[in-house]
């Protein structure tokens, strides 16, 4: 059984933790708010099913959840990455891969400066899921999958990089391809393009006096306009 430590409890942290736990991984969670979490996570899927994942340990202390992990996966905003890496580096076992679901907010640069050179690093070019929390610490929605994933791996031999990519493919049930350099993930930030175009689509016809009966959904009501 693969032992995965998820660091972070946002939308992606909820869905990734629940998804991996429901698919046979032993999942521990590092979060600032352990008291708000249930050990059972319910994740709804686009197919209409609900995944149930059991978290083995939930803690705000890295030494409780990191030492036993076979892989660490950060689900953190950019401003929090440095402090989380600083906390976990002293309890991280040698050679354990550390990765980030979001790589365009400085993960590789911070990890290379803080973690031992023997620590393999990996990061997604795009997030694997569209995720939304329903009830914090209890349930979330997996709203969409990627058809394939691109992964950057650094500080690893080609053989080890291929092994990490293969493990990610198995964990996320999605074809996974290696990028040539972490720069392909670090410098590819899609949100400034996606978010501004979506906001234009929502509001470009707005005029003073126009009101709305409901709050529009950002992703689920996406159009091709």
Map each language-model feature to its residues.
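Active-site-lining helix/loop region of Rossmann-like oxidoreductase modules
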Residues: 150-225
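Nucleotide donor/acceptor-binding cores
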Residues: 2, 147-149
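N-terminal glycine-rich dinucleotide-binding loop that anchors FAD/FMN and/or NAD(P) in oxidoreductases
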Residues: 41-60
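Rossmann-like NAD(P)(H) cofactor-binding subdomain of soluble oxidoreductases
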Residues: 73-74, 78-136
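Short acidic low-complexity segments
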Residues: 54-68, 177
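Short, well-ordered alpha-helix to beta-strand connector turns
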Residues: 24, 55-56, 69, 95
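NAD(P)+-binding Rossmann beta1-loop-alpha1 motif at the extreme N-terminus of oxidoreductases
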Residues: 1-47, 66
């Amino acid at each position: 059984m693969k032992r995965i430590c998820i660091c972070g409890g946002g939308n992606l942290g909820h869905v990734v933790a629940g998804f991996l736990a429901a698919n046979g991984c032993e999942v521990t969670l590092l979060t600032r708010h352990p008291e708000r979490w249930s050990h059972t996570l319910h994740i709804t899927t686009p197919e209409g099913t609900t995944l149930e994942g059991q978290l083995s340990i939930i803690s705000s202390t890295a030494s409780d959840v990191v030492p036993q992990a076979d892989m660490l996966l950060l689900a953190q905003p950019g401003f929090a990455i440095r402090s989380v890496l600083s906390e976990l580096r002293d309890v991280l076992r040698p050679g354990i891969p550390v990765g980030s679901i979001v790589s365009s907010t400085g993960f590789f640069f911070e990890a290379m400066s803080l973690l031992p050179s023997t620590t393999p690093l990996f990061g997604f070019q795009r997030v694997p899921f569209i995720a939304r929390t329903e009830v914090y610490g209890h349930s979330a929605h997996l709203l969409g999958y990627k058809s394939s994933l691109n992964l950057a791996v650094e500080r690893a031999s080609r053989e080890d990089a291929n092994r990490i990519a293969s493990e990610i493919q198995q964990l996320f049930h999605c074809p996974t391809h290696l990028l040539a350099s972490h720069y392909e993930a670090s410098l590819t930030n899609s949100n400034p393009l996606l978010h501004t175009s979506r906001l234009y689509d929502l509001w470009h016809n707005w005029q003073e006096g126009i009101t709305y009966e409901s709050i529009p959904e950002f992703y689920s009501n996406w159009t091709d306009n």
